[in-house]
């Protein structure tokens, strides 16, 4: 991969932030109703369309 433009870097940064797990305090607060993040993405298995 060559040079990344600033716009592409910004989009990849957003995707990286979205790719985190649900915080433990959210699981406790919702009494384990919310346990998984449907937007989780594996870097090798699925593409980011970038």
From Swiss-Prot:
Residues 1-12 have a biased composition (Basic residues). The keyword Ribosomal protein applies. Gene3D superfamilies: Ribosomal protein L39e. GO terms for biological process: translation. The keyword Cell wall biogenesis/degradation does not apply. One of its GO terms (molecular function) is structural constituent of ribosome. This is Large ribosomal subunit protein eL39. Belongs to the eukaryotic ribosomal protein eL39 family. GO terms for cellular component: ribonucleoprotein complex; ribosome. InterPro entries: Ribosomal_eL39, Ribosomal_eL39_CS, Ribosomal_eL39_dom_sf. NCBIfam families: PRK01242.1 (NF002316). Pfam families: Ribosomal_L39 (PF00832). It comes from Haloquadratum walsbyi (strain DSM 16790 / HBSQ001). Disulfide bonds: none annotated. Residues 1-21 are annotated as: Disordered. Keywords: Ribonucleoprotein, Ribosomal protein.
């Amino acid at each position: 991969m060559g040079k990344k433009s600033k716009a592409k870097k910004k989009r990849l940064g957003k995707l990286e932030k979205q790719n985190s797990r649900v915080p433990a305090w959210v699981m406790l607060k919702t009494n384990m109703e919310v346990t998984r993040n449907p937007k989780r993405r594996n870097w090798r298995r699925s593409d980011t369309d970038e």
